[in-house]
């Protein structure tokens, strides 16, 4: 009888989280060198608003009447310095077009409301001698996420229905803090690993509402293990309680020590 996998975010949820927290994004068009895109924002209709140098090849190609086929690659890096730092990659394929000039100001406002990215100031202007950027639309045709376990495609309707993980923004700082200042927490969590995986360098790898992931770095390679919470959590209070349960701290689970 197959062993059930522990609860985990869906592929659509993972893509939505990477869209928010990705530490690298590249825009590629056949026949041109891929370029960094400092803005990559998923809009309500499923298109991505992206930016590229106003005088660059991407903007020129997107200026054609029919646009051009393009791929947006988002990289999800682990927040710690690991031997294999890339946790997942997301590829968004679609048709790239320039945003008509009259629509740019309103679209910038929409993006800035959710993500006040300083690079938005470079669209149609050049503050502090930075590169002038153009705002482009990538009309999504397909979305794929890949990690060490394989690749999975996601329908656009499922992508729009999903939401980013509630902890994707604080995940990096939280894991860095635990790894640097609270190794005792990591040691307690590591005690829940299979005995065969307890030898090696154990580091926090990921955090989401379903649980924690640990990376075990050994001479024979890396092993990732999910430690699921008893139930999904949606706020910091619930997160703290769930982690204490994983650590095996009885009094912090809601019990109280006897007095007297």
Predicted regions and their residues:
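An N-terminal domain-cap segment
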Residues: 1-63
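Catalytic micro-motifs at enzyme active sites that drive phosphoryl/nucleotidyl and oxygen chemistry
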Residues: 14, 36-39, 58-59, 77-83, ...
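A general structural signal for short secondary-structure junctions and capping/turn motifs
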Residues: 16-19, 62-64, 82-83, 88, ...
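Short, surface-exposed beta-edge/turn micro-motifs
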Residues: 22-25, 45-47, 67-69, 132-135, ...
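A structural signal for short, well-ordered beta-strand segments and their strand-loop junctions
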Residues: 26-28, 73, 135-139
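General beta-strand recognition
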Residues: 48-51, 71, 137, 213
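Short, structured beta-strand-loop surface elements
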Residues: 55-118, 133, 142, 222-224
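C-terminal edge-of-domain segments
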Residues: 107-260
């Amino acid at each position: 009888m197959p062993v059930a996998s522990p609860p985990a975010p869906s592929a659509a949820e993972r893509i939505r989280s990477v869209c928010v927290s990705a530490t690298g994004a590249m825009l590629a068009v056949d026949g041109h060198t891929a370029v960094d895109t400092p803005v990559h924002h998923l809009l309500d209709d499923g298109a991505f608003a992206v930016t590229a140098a106003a005088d660059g090849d991407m903007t020129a190609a997107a200026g054609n009447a029919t646009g051009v086929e393009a791929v947006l690659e988002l990289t999800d890096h682990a927040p710690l310095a690991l031997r294999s730092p890339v946790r997942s990659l997301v590829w968004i394929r679609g048709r790239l077009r320039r945003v008509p000039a009259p629509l740019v100001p309103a679209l910038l406002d929409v993006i800035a409301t959710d993500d006040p990215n300083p690079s938005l100031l470079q669209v149609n202007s050049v503050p502090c001698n930075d590169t002038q950027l153009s705002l482009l639309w990538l009309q999504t045709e397909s979305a794929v996420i890949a990690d060490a376990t394989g690749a999975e495609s996601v329908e656009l309707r499922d992508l729009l229905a999903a939401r980013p993980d509630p902890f994707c923004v604080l995940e990096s700082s939280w894991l860095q803090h635990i790894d640097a200042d609270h190794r005792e927490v990591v040691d307690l969590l590591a005690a829940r690993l299979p005995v065969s995986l307890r030898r090696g360098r154990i580091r926090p790898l990921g955090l989401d509402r379903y649980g924690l992931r640990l990376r075990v770095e050994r001479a024979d390679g890396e092993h990732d293990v999910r430690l699921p919470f008893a139930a999904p959590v949606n706020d910091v209070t619930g997160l703290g309680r769930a982690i204490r349960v994983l650590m095996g701290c009885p009094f912090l689970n809601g019990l109280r020590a006897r007095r007297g």
